[in-house]
C-alpha cells in the first residue's frame, strides 16, 4: 500500500498533464537538414560564390545542420472569435562536433587566451527566435474572415525550393491585417521592421539603421484556368537617428526611402506549377536584386538614384509517370549602387530532374550555372562565373518531388569559369574546382 501511495501524486500529475494537453492541443511543426560530407581538400566546400546555393542549387551543396521547431496553439475560441499563439526556435551549425553550443571559440589565441589579429570567433552553433506572434480572427466587423496579427513571424514568404532562394520575404517583427476578401482576391497589409546593419562600400561596419517596411498585397486574382496573379508593393522607410544624421558617415545622411513592385503569375501545369515573377525597385532595393536579397534587408547605403529589377521563372512540373523536373531561371540587375558602380548583373540557371524507381526510391540530378558581372563607371568590367553538377540517390516517404523525410547519398562537382572578382574559391584559395561527397537527410512536418 505504501508503494501505491507513493506513486499516486505522480499518476495524478501525469493524468492532469494529459487532460490539459487534450483541452489545449499544441500544433507541432518543424524542418531540418543535416548530414555528413567531405571534399577533395578536407570538409565539404560550398563557397563557389556568395549566395552559392541560391545560384547553382542546393542539392549536394549544403554543409550545415539547420533545424526549426514550431509550436502553436489556439488559446481562445468563442462566438466566432479565435486567438492563436505561434512560436518557432531555429538552430544552425556546421555539424562538425557532437556537442555544439553557443560557447565562443576563437580559431587562434595568444598565450593569455585573447584573440589574435585575423582570427575568427568560431561558435559551434547559433540559436535564434524566429517567430513569436498572436494571430486573431473574427475581430474585424468589416472583414471577419481576416487575420489580425502582431509579433515576430514568417510573413507570406515566396521562395524557390531547389535553391533555397527567398525572393519576396519581409519576415520579422511587425503587425498587420491578412486576408481581407476584396472582389476575387484577398488584400493583406503589414508593417515590419527590417533594420540595416550599416555596411559601407569599403566594407566597414557601423551601427544599425532603423528601417521600417510597409507591405501591401493583393493575392489570388483569377486569370484563366489554373492561372492566378499576385501583386504587391513594398515601401522601405529609412529612419536614421539624429546622431546618425549628424555623423560624418554619408550612408546615414544620404539614406533614401525605396519602393519595390512585385507581380507573380502562377500557372498550374499537369499537377505541377510554374511561376513567373517580375520585380522593380528603387534606391536600396537595387542591392536586393543584385545580391540575391529576399527583402528581409534593405540596402539603405545605396547611392541616391540607384534602381534595379529582377525576373524569375521557377516551378516543378511532372513529365510522365516516372519523371519530375524542378527549375529556376533568374536575372537581376542593380544600377548606380555606389560611386564607381554603373551596372551589376547576375544570372542563374538551375535544373533538377528526378526519376522515380518506385514509391520510395529515386535518382536525382541537379545542374546549375551562374554569372555575375560588375561594370564600373570607367567602362571596365569584372566577371565571376561557375557551375555545379550533382548526382544523388534518395530514399523518401513517397514518390513525390516533395515527399519527405528523405535521405540522399550524393556526389557534386563545383567549378569556376571566371574568377576576376572572387579569385580561387576552393582549397584555401589554391584551386578553382572541387568534389563533394556526402549523405544528407531533410524533413518537414
Curated annotation (Swiss-Prot):
Catalytic activity: beta-maltose(in) = beta-maltose(out)
Pfam families: LamB
Top-level taxon in the UniProt lineage: Bacteria
Induction: By maltose.
Location, primary (coarse class): membrane
Keyword annotations of the record: Cell outer membrane, Ion transport, Membrane, Porin, Signal, Sugar transport, Transmembrane, Transmembrane beta strand, Transport
UniProt subcellular location: Cell outer membrane
UniProt entry tagged with the keyword Membrane: yes
A GO cellular component entry from the record: cell outer membrane
Membrane topology: Multi-pass membrane protein
GO BP annotations listed: monoatomic ion transport
Signal peptide from the UniProt entry: 1-25
Listed GO MF terms: maltodextrin transmembrane transporter activity; maltose transporting porin activity
Gene3D superfamilies tied to this protein: Porin, LamB type (2.40.170.10)
Keyword Transmembrane helix attached: no
Record-annotated site: Important in sugar transport: 166
Residues annotated as site: Greasy slide, important in sugar transport: 31, 66, 99, 273, 402, 444
Family under the similarity heading: Belongs to the porin LamB (TC 1.B.3) family.
Task performed by this protein: Involved in the transport of maltose and maltodextrins.
Subunit structure, as described in the record: Homotrimer formed of three 18-stranded antiparallel beta-barrels, containing three independent channels.
Name of protein: Maltoporin
Species of provenance: Aeromonas salmonicida
